[in-house]
UniProtKB/Swiss-Prot annotation:
Keywords: Cell outer membrane, Membrane, Signal, Transmembrane, Transmembrane beta strand
Membrane topology: Multi-pass membrane protein
GO molecular function, one term: long-chain fatty acid transporting porin activity
Protein name (database record): Outer membrane protein P1
Annotated gene: ompP1
Assigned protein family: Belongs to the OmpP1/FadL family.
GO cellular component: cell outer membrane
Main location, first listed in the record: membrane
Source organism: Haemophilus influenzae
Subcellular locations according to the entry: Cell outer membrane
Entry keyword annotation includes Plastid: no
Amino acid sequence: MKKFNQSLLATAMLLAAGGANAAAFQLAEVSTSGLGRAYAGEAAIADNASVVATNPALMSLFKTAQFSTGGVYIDSRINMNGDVTSYAQIITNQIGMKAIKDGSASQRNVVPGAFVPNLYFVAPVNDKFALGAGMNVNFGLKSEYDDSYDAGVFGGKTDLSAINLNLSGAYRVTEGLSLGLGVNAVYAKAQVERNAGLIADSVKDNQITSALSTQQEPFRDLKKYLPSKDKSVVSLQDRAAWGFGWNAGVMYQFNEANRIGLAYHSKVDIDFADRTATSLEANVIKEGKKGNLTFTLPDYLELSGFHQLTDKLAVHYSYKYTHWSRLTKLHASFEDGKKAFDKELQYSNNSRVALGASYNLYEKLTLRAGIAYDQAASRHHRSAAIPDTDRTWYSLGATYKFTPNLSVDLGYAYLKGKKVHFKEVKTIGDKRTLTLNTTANYTSQAHANLYGLNLNYSF
């Protein structure tokens, strides 16, 4: 067999436990108008049809049908600095043999650029009822390390996307109170590659190779399975699955100039299945078996306010709370019940606060600005795949109306993340006879530039 895969299915999600632009792997980039104000006021502002993705109750404010489409390009810069040590240890006849290899865990720009698209439509049915539909990406990440990366079991390639399809309705209960409800279908795809790195060098030691020959399969032929650093030890190619959830919102408008909104998005369970899953830890290397993993996208709650202070100036704010502690651990098993993988995540619930302002310079041009602070979710367990960190947003944006029906949104944001130090450790084997261990010490710092463009049309 050309490659063995260590907990293919579960590791796919484990190694995707990080994010460059929002806590863990949650994305905030649902619209360009929101980008320009650091997504302050999302549950209370009805700039355009993107309310489908934020608070469906806001659809009751629309007098005519509206279409909005566009996206945000994320140009991330994440640099990793550190060192890695790998060792293979075998104990036979009470005699221990150990081979230790040291290397570099440093690499620059581990996150490539990515485009986050969106598409929305809102249609009022009558004075009280409105319908809406939309497509956006609210969870996702991508990171890439060199194939020969010394800490290959932690780096490699990770590509996770969760496309959310939404159908919503809004009902105006009273002149000031509106309610909204929606259903979500999430199409998720995952691609993961992890390489042996220094593990391959440690098992090539002559004493270790000799001692391995006395072991049972699959460990006896480890040298053959791991001929080089770039040998794949985890491979999950474009596995896809569907998950379903719901969202709800309430909006209360005190008057034309003041309103508040509250929106909730439920958790979404996604069941991945891999009929070629293998696991070194479960001694399944030479032939794959069907493996199963249920992964949860967390629920979140957002409270927002909008206040038109003058004819030209408005302020808006948001508090967003995401229930990341639902992800306590990742567990994958084979059809026969044998454990393939079990990993504690230690995620913490996180908060995001944002403050923004809009200014109508003249009839055709609206300017925006905002600032936000986004708390990390993986404060107790960080990952080299994309290390999570607290980050601050600085945003600017504008909307220009070419005609009463056609407008364009432009937005820019600079995200600055805190410098973080963390360690990753991976141990394979029973620790009584054979142990393969890799330990990496990291220092990372991230920043990103975000560019948004949306086209809006009112019918």
